[in-house]
Amino acid sequence: MNDSKLFFQFLFPQGYEVFLFDDVKNPPNLFVAHYYTDDEVERYFSAVDNYHSSYNRLHCIQLPVLFRILYCCGTRIGETLGIRKKDIDLESGIIRLTETKNGKERYVTMGGELLALARRFADRTFYQIADDEYVFRNKNGGGLKYDTIKHIHREILAMAGIPFVGNSHGPRIHDWRHTFAIRSFKHMSDNGTDMYVALPILSTYLGHGTIMATEHYLRLTLEMFPEIEEKMGKTAEKVFGGIMYEGN
């Protein structure tokens, strides 16, 4: 776009009729990412594990798994609700995500504690459902809907004593994905991984269409943990100058 504008600016004084447009900028992202602190994580999942619903008795055994997948695997809520029985390998802990934002399936891995919890969940529920049915279900046997989980999320925040600010400040369900990404960058940095090596790895794992969305998470990580930026030096300023990012 800039090269074209310069060319038109050159033509205009030569007598050519051209139209010069103002620079087009992407609209700002109005949502403010919330990073769940260690204390908030502990309180939130304590509330999840003690959540009961007379409306759907499955909630007490499926919500601890569902919300931990969001936090521990960094999945989007739509991808998580789209998990079917056949998508989970309870031996390896690998989950196949098929209902993704960009239509490309990918894989995430459950760690030891989450995998143990998922196995207990499977022991109690998988015998009731076919391979192609959703694992997170409503009381009628259909897949859970986003609006239901959104409502439960608000209830859990209240139980945990975590204020819901609203007005694009959350904390939202999607902020578990933000928290996963930031913690992943921090963990890799602490283990000596160069951030420019970590960037494409995490971008692929998160299923981003381009690396720009992942760069946004790296920017947030550097803001929260300045010591990482000090390791990176002045290169970070060159990389992040003027970057706009896509939905994540």
What are these regions (language model features)?
Residues 53-57, 151-200, 204, 208:
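Short, basic (Lys/Arg/His-rich) helix/loop patches that form interaction surfaces
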Residues 1-13, 22, 110:
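Non-catalytic DNA-binding core/recognition domains of DNA-processing enzymes
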Residues 102-119, 132-154, 166-173:
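C-terminal catalytic core of Y-nucleophile DNA break-rejoin enzymes
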Residues 35, 99, 206-234:
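Catalytic-site neighborhood detector that most strongly recognizes the C-terminal catalytic loop/helix
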Residues 46-77:
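Basic, Lys/Arg- and aromatic-enriched nucleic-acid-binding interface segment
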Residues 16-48, 98, 138-140:
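Flexible interdomain linker/hinge and immediately adjacent N-terminus
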Residues 232-248:
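C-terminal secondary-structure termini that scaffold catalytic or DNA-interacting sites
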Residues 73, 78, 82-116:
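Conserved tyrosine-mediated DNA breakage-rejoining catalytic core shared by Y-recombinases
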